[in-house]
Each structure stands twice: as C-alpha cells, then as structure tokens.
Amino acid sequence: MPEYKLQAPYTPKGDQPAAIKGLVGGVNDGEKFQTLLGATGTGKTFTIANLIAQTGRPALVLAHNKTLAAQLCNELREFFPDNAVEYFISYYDYYQPEAYVPVSDTYIAKTSSINEEIDMLRHSATRSLFERDDVIVVASISCIYGLGIPSEYLKASVKFQVGQSIDLRSCLRSLVSNQYTRNDIEISRGRFRVRGDVLEIGPAYDDRLVRLELFGDEVESISYVDPTTGEILNKLDSINIYPAKHFVTPKDRLDSAIKAIKKELKDRLEFLNQEGKLLEAQRLEQRTIYDLEMLKEVGYCNGVENYARHLSGREPGSAPECLIDYFPKDWLLLIDESHVTCPQLRAMYNGDQARKKVLIDHGFRLPSAADNRPLKDIEFWNKAKQTVFISATPGDWELSQSTKNIVEQVIRPTGVLDPLVEVRPTHGQVDDLLFEIRKRASKNQRILVTTLTKRMAEDLTDYLSENKIRVRYLHSEIHSIERIEIIQDLRLGEYDVLVGVNLLREGLDLPEVSLVVILDADKEGFLRAQRSLIQTIGRAARHVEGLALLYADKMTDSMAKAISETERRREIQNIYNIEHGITPKPAGKKASNSILSFLEISRRLNQDGSTDDFVDIADKLIEHSAKDSDSGVSLESLPELIEKLESKMKIKAKDLDFETAAILRDRIKKLRHRLVGR
C-alpha cells in the first residue's frame, strides 16, 4: 500500500471525523459508489485528503473545469508535499475541431495550438502512474479522451542504468522512433543531442535534462541537469525515458493499420457509389489516399487521430484507452461538484458523435473516424472501480447509485451557520435592494445579485451605478481570465456588488460575501431549480452575517425545498455550536498578494508589456506562491506566463542583451518548478 504523508496545520473537526470514517469504511468494504454530501465551506477537500491518506489508493480527482482543477491541485499539493500530485487538463490553448456545415457547403479544417507546459504536466502524470503508487491526479473532463495505449507507451520506454552496456546507435534509433528529435545545437523537451561520450535528453515529462555520461559502451553516470546553466542537479542510478508523445505505433502495427484503412476505404467507396454519392466518394478517396501515403512515408498525417482505431488495433465500436487505463487496478475515483461533472461525462460522447456523423456522411472521413472519441457514459463507469461523489447538491443519479452510502458533512470548522433565508415580495424590490446593499457596503461587506436575463442584469447594473453604488456586471461573454479578475476585484474591495445571471454557483470561495440576492426566485426553471438555489444561497455561507434574499410573489416547490434544506442544515450547525461552546468566526483567506500578482499577470498578458514588467510580475508570483497558493488560479496562469517570458528571453538573446536574458531564464526556471510542484 502506498504511503501518503498528509501534512495539515489542523485536525478534523465538527462532523469531518465521522465523514472520514464513513467514507474510509465504505472504500474498505468495497462499496462501488458513495456520496459526500458536504455543505459549502465544511472542508470537503480536507476530508477527501484524509480519505486518500487512510485508504492508500492512487486517486483520480475529477473537476468540471480547469480553474477548479487548478484550485484542487494546489490544495492537495499543500496537503501532500511529499507525494505525487499531478495536474491533467486539455493541452490546447486553442482548438477548432474539424467540421462541415452542409447548409452553406462550408468545410472547417481542424486548427489548434498546443501548450507545451501543460503537455509536460500530462506526461508527468502518466510517468508518475507508471513509477509510483502514491499518486493523485487532478483532472478535467479531458481525461476521458483517447491517450494512446498504456502497454505500448510503457513498452516503448528506454531504460538506462549506471553500469549498463548499451549500443549508442540503437539507443538513438529508439529515441527517434519514440518521436524525439536530434538537435545538437539547441536542446529542449522532446529533443536529444550527442557530444562525444555524453548523451543529453529533454524528457517529455520534465523541464530538466537527463545527461548520460558514457565510458565506451558503459553508462558511467546518469544525472538531472539544468537546461540553461548545465549545473548537475542530482545523480541517479537509473531512469526510464518515456516516448515524447502518448500515441506510440510500432512499425508492424502501422503496416497492419494501413492495410485495414485501405480495406475500409474500398468498402466505403462501394457503398457511396451504390448510393449515387459520387462527389462524396471522390472526396473521400482523394483525402484518404493522400493520408495513407503520408502514413507510409513519415508515419504521420494531418488528422491522424481519425485513424486511431486502426493504429491501436481496436475493434469497431470498442472503447478508446484513456488516462484511466494508466492507473493500477486498485484506484479511487473522486468526482468534485458531481451534480455538474456527471452530466458532462454523459454529454461529451453525444456532442462528438453528432459532428463526426456529418463528416462521415459527406465523405470527409471514413466511418472508423467515429471511434476516435471520448468514452461513453457506460464505458467510463465500467472502468471506474470505486467512486465517491462530492457535492453540496448531488444529482438524483448520484444519490440513486449511492443508496445507503451517503455521508453528510454540514458542520463548518469555523462554526459559521448556513445563511438566513428571507422571502420578500417583488413590489418595491429595487428600492429594498438598494437599502440592503448600502447597509452591507457600509460594513465593508460584498453582495451578489443574480437575475434571470442578461438584459435585466445590465439594466440593474446601470441603475445601481446611477445611485452611486460600486457595481460590476458579470456575463457569459467575459473570458475566464477577466472573469477571475472581476471576482478578485470584488474580494479586494474595488467594488461592492456583483450582478450576473448564473453567478458562481459552484467552486470559488468568496468569504467576503455576506448577502446573496436572487431576483425572480419564483420563476421555475434551470436557474431557479432546487439545486441552483441551494448553490447560490451557499455563496453567503462563509460569512458570519450571511443572508440570502429571495424576491418572489409565490412559494414554488423548488424554493420551499431549498429553504427547508438550508434551515435543516442551519439547525444542525446551531445545535452543534451550542453543545460545544463554539462562537462562529470568519471563514476563508483574505485576497492576498499572490492574487494581486495574478491580476497583474492577466492584465499584462492582454497587452505587450515591457520586459521589466514581466520580470517584476514573475518575481512577485515566485515570492508569494511559496507562502500562499490561494485559489489555484496562479497555477492555471503559469503556462501562459512562461511562454511570454521565453519569448522575451529569446528576443533579448538575439539583441545580445545576455544579462536580461539570463534574468528571464532564472525566472522561467523557478516558475517551472512551481508548475510541476517542486
């Protein structure tokens, strides 16, 4: 059993010990599904950390977006500094999938931009899963997409040991077949070089170089080396060099795949010609023959993923192998905000197939392209051995699967109660709202107001602004970095009120918010359903004076259930506080300098700031990230910042300003260490 060393400045409190005991017992008893029904701010992540530590299982923590994944990864790295906590999200900075619009006869080619830093983290995750047992991978939904064949990936790895006799030419051929490229001038990730009796490799999973010093045919020493200074960082007895890409296809399998593609093409052309689809048949034949020539000559073609079924030797309709298949047999799945994440799992396959069907029907792709896909819902659950759903408002499906294995956690370690809930009539609601906002703002507290439509949110924002209220409006067209910036400005007191349609129902903590206002609470629908109301009310659950105002003229079933559940939790919390003599105290961290530095980063990334600005931003982030990881957004921003700094460094080196280039190089090194958790 792997040993997890949980490090925390506090011990489980409230109903955390009972929740931990219940979940650990369920895992040890082999329960397939459990649910942690934890109210906002009760320390669900700490409970999960204890569960992982006590069961000793490799764990996959699934979040529904990369911001929450970054937040969870940061928190778990704090709890497990000596264990492997990896971050696995989509490596695309930009992705436009291949598509065809029949109505306008428009073909859209696939275009994408891969973030090399995130690709490194993905390789780091799979490497840890092969080499360690104490591994926690925090992933987004991208983990259900194909990721090569684990057995082939492992088989293709090249192992070096001190004292081992090797044939250097054979090793170099192995590296090339594993998609490393030789570059004796500039070495980086995915490259290698040979200088005399020294072989240096930039492994796909690390920002450090691996140096092998040879004496004749014998490996004399192996060491990690700083890629810019050449300084030896530490010596090794042995090392595995894994392929530069997760998709590894041996020569014999490639030959078999080409034959299978030719056969499928022949069958498909016969079908299209019989159907009288001559244009589609000609289009498909031209594209596929060109792709086959490319595969035969260079082993690669544009859109090679569409032939994934043939290249991996899978049967038609069979499930692709993904990140889950890199885990050992005895692993644990933890799904955060399961009421959002589980529907995502179901939606991914259907959306992908709808787009592929159009491409196949119109002769752009062979039918086998449909098998380059994410996992189906049933395939995912067949691979998952034991699952814990985590949510303040679990969905009906999660609850039905867990049946009796539902563990509740409603008591906050801080003693803060769920907010009071008041229902007020809509007549005169705007003036009443204005009064409540001024009252809270005078105490330096923050307010969230949620409306049903964008137009209503805009009009309300304008009205509040005219009445001298410091207010901002959040809507769906705001990009993620600016969205985080607006949220943190709220925390920092740049303004007092945030108005929006679907405001932060899950995830980010806002301990400064004491008032949540829900307009048109009696309009039944997705945004005013029971779970949505509970999640929105929960945004005020971290403040001692938390209050939720629902403006409505009638009591809907959803409102009644949400209010009843909030009052039930509040009563449990109050009784516990009285019995244990607990006085509620403010929850959460204050927005700190690490957040401020992130805001500077996001602003500078949207304009081409000076080199000094970027160095200053990097210095602030390095200084504060060591002390405070806050909400995890800094982790999410690092790949983009590193790319900017590298671009600046190359420009300075080209201009012969080596002093500034060296300063930038040092900052990049420190930021990369922060990114991989070292």
Swiss-Prot record:
NCBIfam families: PRK05298.1, uvrb. A motif (Beta-hairpin) lies at residues 91-114. ATP binds at residues 38-45. GO terms for molecular function: ATP binding; ATP hydrolysis activity; DNA binding; excinuclease ABC activity. Residues 25-412 form the Helicase ATP-binding domain. The UvrABC repair system catalyzes the recognition and processing of DNA lesions. A damage recognition complex composed of 2 UvrA and 2 UvrB subunits scans DNA for abnormalities. Upon binding of the UvrA(2)B(2) complex to a putative damaged site, the DNA wraps around one UvrB monomer. DNA wrap is dependent on ATP binding by UvrB and probably causes local melting of the DNA helix, facilitating insertion of UvrB beta-hairpin between the DNA strands. Then UvrB probes one DNA strand for the presence of a lesion. Belongs to the UvrB family. Forms a heterotetramer with UvrA during the search for lesions. Interacts with UvrC in an incision complex. PROSITE patterns: HELICASE_ATP_BIND_1 (PS51192), HELICASE_CTER (PS51194), UVR (PS50151). SUPFAM superfamilies: C-terminal UvrC-binding domain of UvrB (SSF46600), P-loop containing nucleoside triphosphate hydrolases (SSF52540). HAMAP family: UvrB. This is UvrABC system protein B. Keywords: ATP-binding, Cytoplasm, DNA damage, DNA excision, DNA repair, Excision nuclease, Nucleotide-binding, SOS response. It holds the Pfam family UVR. GO terms for biological process: nucleotide-excision repair; SOS response. Transmembrane segments: none annotated. It comes from Prochlorococcus marinus (strain NATL2A). Residues 429-591 form the Helicase C-terminal domain. It is found in: Cytoplasm. Its main location: cytoplasm. It comes from the Bacteria. CDD domains: DEXHc_UvrB, SF2_C_UvrB. One of its GO terms (cellular component) is cytoplasm. The beta-hairpin motif is involved in DNA binding. Residues 639-674 form the UVR domain.
